[in-house]
Every structure is written in structure tokens, then in C-alpha cells.
């Protein structure tokens, strides 16, 4: 998974054609708060496919496993 972002959004690219964009806030000390309730649909061309709660949980778990002291720390709220 590739994770990219701006000061107010984060994109989770599953590297299989599926991408999910979420809203959030970049904080000080290399932290980013991700608003889970904004994780509602895939980016085009898959925007018509539903994303399940399990799919969201898998994205969160994978992202948390990728964290290290060298990366931005993600907090899902």
C-alpha cells in the first residue's frame, strides 16, 4: 500500500487499482488524524463499488503496520 497526503487529505492506494481518499488534519510532531467517517467510497474508476466496514478496517490495520519512527503517525478517529 502507498500512502500519500496533503495537509487535509490522505490517500490509501492499495496498488491494485483501488484508492481511498479520506479527510483529516496534519498535526505537529509528524502526526496525521484521519477521520474514519470520511472513508466512504473508492476513488474513480471504482466509485460505484461499495466499501465495507471490513475493507476499511483492513486499510487501517495495514496502514498501522507500516508505521515506523521515520514515518508520519496516523490516528484514526
Spans of features found by a protein language model:
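Amphipathic, interaction-prone secondary-structure segments
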Residues: 1-27
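Acidic, low-complexity intrinsically disordered segments
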Residues: 31-77
